[in-house]
């Protein structure tokens, strides 16, 4: 059985069924995938030249981007952190707490590509279970190989977006038992 989901939704699903003793894995197409990320932006039309609104918006983004708040959001929604935390290792420590393993069968999972900053000599390779290296950890922090073959989607225009939306619906609702009329 396969299901198409964003990584955060995949993590949520994996956590939910794990309580029932069901194990799910997260997979990324070998050819390519879109690079997914969430972010906040300040719209010019919403802030305009209002310095107080701009300051409030910047304060909010700064607040939710503090490592301690990033961890709270990761815990609550299951999505990847928007920042690495810089010199603050709170986010990395949280990931190790959630997905780390000291079992003899654990495997190395390299997160240097995400966390290592210029001049940082810390080695962000953690021990995790084989299961997590293909499950929740992999969904939140895919391997560097996956990141290399990922691309940011662009805006296609109204007509193309309608076609893409139709393709997405067809894919999500695909039922191999139903034969499509070829006429």
Name each model-derived stretch.
Residues 1-29:
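Ligand-binding pocket segment of bilobal, Venus flytrap-like solute-binding proteins
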Residues 7-12, 31-34, 47-48, 68:
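Solvent-exposed loop/turn segments at secondary-structure junctions
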Residues 13-16, 63-70, 76, 167-174:
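Structured segments of extracytoplasmic/periplasmic soluble domains
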Residues 117-183:
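Conserved C-terminal helix/tail region of periplasmic/extracytoplasmic solute-binding proteins
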């Amino acid at each position: 059985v396969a299901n198409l989901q964003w990584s955060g939704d995949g993590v949520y699903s994996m956590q939910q069924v794990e309580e029932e003793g069901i194990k799910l894995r997260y997979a990324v197409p070998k050819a390519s995938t879109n690079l997914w990320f969430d972010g906040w932006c300040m719209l010019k039309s919403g802030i305009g030249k209002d310095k107080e609104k701009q300051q409030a918006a910047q304060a909010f983004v700064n607040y939710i981007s503090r490592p301690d708040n990033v961890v709270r959001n990761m815990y609550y929604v299951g999505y990847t952190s928007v920042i690495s935390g810089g010199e603050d290792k709170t986010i990395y420590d949280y990931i190790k707490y959630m997905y780390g393993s000291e079992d003899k069968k654990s495997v190395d999972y390299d997160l240097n590509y995400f966390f290592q900053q210029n001049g940082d000599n810390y080695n962000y390779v953690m021990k995790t279970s084989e299961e997590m290296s293909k499950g929740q950890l992999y969904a939140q922090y895919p391997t560097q190989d996956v990141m290399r073959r990922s691309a940011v989607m662009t805006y296609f225009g109204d007509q193309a977006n309608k076609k893409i939306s139709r393709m997405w619906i067809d894919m999500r609702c695909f039922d191999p038992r139903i034969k499509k009329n070829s006429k």
